[in-house]
Regions:
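Hydrophobic mid-bilayer segments of alpha-helices in multi-pass membrane transport proteins
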Residues: 9-14, 163-172, 193-209, 236-244
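Short hydrophobic/aromatic segments of transmembrane alpha-helices and their interfaces
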Residues: 53, 90-93, 200-201, 275-276, ...
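Membrane-core helix-loop-helix motifs of multi-pass transport proteins
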Residues: 82-172, 306-317, 323-335
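A cytosolic-side transmembrane-helix exit/cap motif
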Residues: 148-150, 179-187, 240-243, 275-280
């Protein structure tokens, strides 16, 4: 837990420093105004033009590009800003729950990390899981939003929300059609290139906004980086607790026992048990990203990156998030 938190320290310091520049440069507020028509309906508890809206947008955008390292500090910053609005500090507010569910649903348009792993493991077409990943994460995110809206009694028939959902469906469908017409090599090349260019543009844009506002960019970055370091220290106990529980689950043999039972049940029903070999990745993913990643790589190494199991584990790894880890991390950061 301490080693993971230590590894996050540099990333948190970098991105919270960049976010602080963007906040004082007016970029975060601009994002808040841009997303207000939709976010004001999904997050009715957040005041108009509040910085939390911009931070939520930045976190979701980073997740869309598959940039996990960038999304984490942005998400932690959003949670801190939501906690400031929370009237019951020891309980999660409705906006917190909505944000956490959207974040944990794993919406990804460009799975850069998964395609990189598949390329390293010798896949003939590393991007061949692109469309299944996009459709799976879109479905999970849509269900998450609708479920929370139902629970929080948010009217989904509002004009802005209907336009938002319709726009999402049209965009995903158009993107799927576009990439379906391209070769796998082109999909991998252009999606990775787009993600990297956009990431670099965001950093440059934030810095330029700070210069235009005539703020001290260096001091502002250091101020945000200090917040990143403090956040990394704060989450250590929560990470250790969840990682100990995961270690006990694995070391006790409970996971092997569970998988063995499922294999027997599926076999007794006369069904194909091939998918069972992907269950270790499926069961580990909600608990530990690094553990699931290791099992995915082991599956690709054992069965081949282009095998059914290799593709299945890649899709599972890329289309879901480490739910319990995210809960511990995000709620731990706000106490």
């Amino acid at each position: 837990g301490f080693e993971i938190s230590l590894g996050l320290t540099g990333v948190l310091a970098l991105w919270l420093g960049i976010m602080k520049i963007g906040e004082k440069g007016g970029v975060i507020q601009a994002f808040a105004r841009l997303t207000a028509p939709v976010f004001s309906k999904l997050f009715p508890g957040i005041p108009k033009d509040h910085p939390a809206t911009g931070s939520i947008f930045m976190c979701i955008s980073a997740n869309l590009l598959g940039l996990d390292n960038a999304a984490t500090p942005m998400g932690l910053k959003a949670m801190k800003e939501l906690q400031e609005l929370n009237t019951q500090k020891d309980s999660a507010s409705d906006p917190m729950i909505m944000f956490l569910c959207i974040n944990a649903s794993g919406l990804t348009l460009i799975p850069v990390s998964i395609m990189t792993y598949r390329a390293q493991m010798g896949a003939a077409n590393p991007a061949d899981v692109f469309l299944p990943l996009m459709l799976a994460t879109f479905s999970s995110t849509l269900v998450a939003i609708l479920a929370v809206c139902f629970k929080q009694r948010i009217n989904i028939l509002q004009r802005n929300l209907l336009l938002f959902f319709g726009g999402m469906i049209a965009f995903i469908g158009g993107l799927a059609l576009l990439f379906g017409m391209m070769s796998q090599q082109s999909v991998s090349l252009y999606s990775t290139l787009f993600a990297n260019i956009l990431l670099f543009s965001i950093i440059c844009g934030f810095i330029i906004s700070g210069i235009r506002k005539k703020i001290n960019v260096y001091d502002t970055f250091i101020e945000g980086a200090k917040e990143g370091f403090q956040t990394a220290v704060t989450i250590i106990p929560y990470l250790i607790a969840v990682l100990v529980a995961i270690a006990v689950f694995r070391a006790s043999g409970a996971m092997d026992f569970l998988i063995g039972g499922i294999r027997m049940g599926v076999s007794a029903a006369g069904l194909d048990t091939q998918f069972v070999e992907g269950l270790p990745t499926m069961l580990m993913k909600p608990l530990s990203g690094s553990g699931a990643r290791g099992m995915m790589l082991d599956a690709m190494n054992t069965y081949g990156a282009d095998s059914f199991i290799g593709r299945l584990c890649s899709i599972v790894q890329g289309s879901s998030d480490t739910t319990f880890y995210v809960v511990a991390l995000y709620f731990g950061s706000v106490g």
